[in-house]
Amino acid sequence: MNTLNLVYEGMFAGYNYVMELRRKYDCNMPWILLFDPTSACNLHCKGCWAAEYGNRLNLSFEDMDRIVTEGEALGIHWYMCTGGEPTCRKEDLFKLAAKHQNSVFHLFTNGTLIDQAFCRPRQGSRQHGLLHLHRGHRRCHRSPAAARASMTAS
């Protein structure tokens, strides 16, 4: 999605449609949806719930696609992917972004799985990357190696 489409779909047309549905159904409709593609994480940070659940909880690509498809029908074009570590499912997220080019996907990530291939534009996709690098503080990580990896990833 290019910036102009993001502004139009996510912040103007989509927002106006969400407001229309709020009035029509007399309920609060979100303008952004958050979902966790996976509970898996490559780090084990102190205090983080993901370390307790391991990698058992995963949304299938079909479930993620259904969430976005139904959200778009409601005028929602902004999706925040958290986890676990969402880049553990980066291929599915690339596929999702390529399929839903009128939506934007914001990844809340520790950044340690971002490599050169991740940063290259995807063929057939107009998506631009929106990342929030969650680096935390050194004392929050369970190991010095995890802290260094997270701190140097960006």
Tell what function each PLM region has:
Residues 50-58, 143-149:
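Short glycine-enriched, charge-decorated loop/helix-capping segments at active-site entrances
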Residues 65-81, 89-154:
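Radical SAM/AdoMet-radical enzyme domain recognition
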Residues 1-52, 72:
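N-terminal pre-core extensions flanking Radical SAM catalytic domains
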Residues 13-17, 62, 66, 152:
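Short, contiguous clusters of charged residues that form electrostatic/catalytic patches at enzyme active sites
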Residues 56, 88-89:
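Secondary-structure boundary/capping motif
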